[in-house]
Amino acid sequence: MALDYRKTFEIEIINEFQSAIHSKMLNYVLNNELDKSDSTNLQTNLLNQLSNMNQINLFKLSLEELEAYHEYLRSIKKYADSITRTT
């Protein structure tokens, strides 16, 4: 099995980034005492989506797919930032 250091690096970055977003959403849901099983709640839906995304085997994706996935996570982070912002 050949090592692809660029792909491995991208996977590590994605894993850390995804974990940070998940932690932010989990803290928000817990701090606001939201029901994690409430499918009508936007914040809990995003938390559940992030939890499900942790199950994806990133090593099966191509570098191009990883880069697209990373961009998707950037969009999710912007969205998570906007819905967890306190005034």
From Swiss-Prot:
GO molecular function, one term: toxic substance binding
InterPro entries given in the database record: Antitoxin_epsilon/PezA_dom_sf (IPR035569), Epsilon_PezA_dom (IPR015090)
Domain of life the protein comes from: Bacteria
GO biological process terms on file: negative regulation of cell killing; response to toxic substance
Keywords: Plasmid, Toxin-antitoxin system
Keyword Zinc listed: no
Subunit-level organization: In the presence of the zeta toxin, forms an inactive PezA(2)PezT(2) heterotetramer.
Family that this chain belongs to: Belongs to the epsilon antitoxin family.
Role according to the record: Antitoxin component of a type II toxin-antitoxin (TA) system. Neutralizes the toxic effect of cognate zeta toxin. Part of a postsegregational killing (PSK) system involved in the killing of plasmid-free cells. Continuous synthesis of the epsilon antitoxin is required to counteract the zeta toxin.
Name the UniProt record assigns to this protein: Antitoxin epsilon
Organism: Lactococcus lactis subsp. lactis
